[in-house]
Amino acid sequence: MKIKHTVYLCCAIMALSLASCMTVPKESEIPADATVPDLTQKAQEAFDSGNYRAARVYYETILKRFADDEKACVAAQYEIAHLHIKRRRWNDAYTILEKIIAQYEGPMAMHLPPDYYKLAKIDYTRAAEKLRIKTKQ
């Protein structure tokens, strides 16, 4: 019985230790002079370590601070959609991907990087399949 309690205690301590490593920055804690590449790198590092909430904060910071930079914003939007896919939040991903595709089919499309259109279409189709939604192809 004591061994069982010890094992549970060790598991709880390990879980708390892992949770403390997954800190999520507040937007106010992110340096005001951080550039798009800085924020993207921080987001990617958070993503690679499995801290999707922190990655999302960095991408959302790009959307807020660099709203006039269409290229940076479409990349951040796509990455947020990808975060939703990783967490199997298909509805959220689908909605964002739909908006990205609409941007590429609008008048500002020539200013956007073509790679994200292709990636968004692929993930959009995948999300639609998961949600059992028929798409126009």
Roles of regions detected by a PLM:
Residues 2, 21-137:
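Acidic, polar-rich low-complexity tracts and alpha-helical solenoid repeat scaffolds
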